[in-house]
Amino acid sequence: QFSSVPRRKYLIRGIKVQLPNNAKVDISTTQRYVVSTGATETITSGVGHIGRVTYTGIWDGTFGAATWCADPAWCFYNLLTNTRYGCSIPAVNLQKFEFYAISQYCNELVPDLKGGTGEEPRMLVNVLINQRKQIFEAIKDFTSIFRGQSFYGAGIFSVFQDKPETSRYLIGNANVADGFFEYTGTSQASRHTSCTVAYQDYQKLGEVDFEYVEDVDAVSKYGIINKQ
């Protein structure tokens, strides 16, 4: 007997999106969060990363059948090109290999920071968009998932990602006027030394959780200047 109607949550797979023909989606493991115990139970056997995309060989630019995944790059590509609920941008106006490179970086395995040797994909997306919003706002929200930015120029929509790369230009004193750099500073109040991040925990079916992160050296120098 319940005193009120129980609140239910579901872990579902969303829409199917086009993926490169050399892509494979990991669907080997399904988990559920048990509210009464706070534990996570594995329903099917196998060690996997739900929705992660991996690639075999070199991509020739051809897409395969639409498949569900949790890849932020190709979900974003779908949002841009879809003519029913997206931006209706023709595929010829997109640099698809930029999305491919972003996808590879997002799906690399990194430590899960749970105290063991476990790993998890660097970036995944599991969101529900069920309200109308300005397209530029939607694009900004989506690119923030993979630390990206986008711009439109010369008839081409381009997207790039903030990630480690080889230096493209080395600039020294000989490259600037009079051979000297001019530096500008920022106020101390804007130099955040710690951050409190709110996020929806996938293992808890979307329950909001918080994570506190700080720069130890910066805290010792400026004190705690927190950003939420």
What role is predicted for each listed range?
Residues V47, N126, F160-Q228:
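Surface-exposed, non-catalytic interaction/assembly patches
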Residues Q1-F146, G153, Q200, L205:
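Polar, S/T/G-rich
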Residues G155-S158:
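Hydrophobic residues embedded in beta-strands of well-ordered beta-sheets
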